[in-house]
Regions:
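Signature for HUH/AEP ssDNA processing cores
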Residues: 1-76, 85-87, 126-172
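Residues in well-ordered beta-strands of folded domains
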Residues: 49-51, 72, 82, 100-102, ...
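Beta-rich nucleic-acid/ligand-interaction surfaces
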Residues: 78-80
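Helical (often loop-to-helix) elements that flank the catalytic cores of nucleotide-handling enzymes
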Residues: 83-107, 169-172
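Conserved catalytic-core surface of thiol
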Residues: 99-143, 147
Length: 172
């Protein structure tokens, strides 16, 4: 067996293990192909997708509030947050570039999917929150706080930030 073939066997096993882990915790997942898992939204969870810089600020805001929530990331710079289903995107977030709410049967790449630019991975693994999906209210409230701070800060460069709304340095 060549090195590439053995890698594909190991990766396939890792992908299947991840799919079983999602299923064991009630997260709806489908395997698109040999390198890609998709989380299905709208039955158990919805997903808020944001740019990485916005996601870092949301994570800092949640962390300052003592909340640990799962966070996925794509190599193209999107971060996404699973959350309880049934909400709509608040007006403050609809006006924010590149913020998207995935609902009603949409599918989102799930770790450890391979894409041309790299790997979809966890920034905060769901096991750290026992696969608990945070409430949409908690997550959307934090995202709105960050969006408001960013809008205010753009108008007033010396604006006081809400707790955790801006990460110092690069956090990964």
């Amino acid at each position: 067996m060549s090195g590439w073939d053995s890698y594909r066997v190991v990766y396939g096993a890792e992908l299947r293990a991840a799919a079983h882990e999602f299923e064991d915790h009630g997260w709806p997942v489908v395997e698109r192909d040999a390198t890609t898992l998709l989380l299905v939204t709208g039955t158990v969870l919805d997903i808020l997708e944001v740019p990485a810089s916005f996601g870092r600020q949301v994570c800092a805001h949640l962390r300052d509030a003592g909340e640990v929530v799962p966070v996925g990331a794509a190599p193209t710079g999107e971060w996404w947050f699973p959350m309880s289903m049934g909400s709509t995107l608040p007006a403050e977030l609809r006006d924010t570039a590149d913020v998207r709410l995935h609902t009603a049967g949409e599918m989102v790449l799930a770790p450890p999917s391979a894409v041309p630019d790299g790997w979809v991975h966890w920034r905060v693994a769901p096991a750290l929150s026992s696969y608990h999906v945070p409430s949409a209210d908690l997550l959307l409230h934090s995202a709105v706080d960050v969006a408001r701070w960013r809008a205010d800060h753009a108008l007033r460069p010396g604006a006081q930030r809400p707790a955790g709304a801006m990460a110092v340095g690069m956090r990964s």
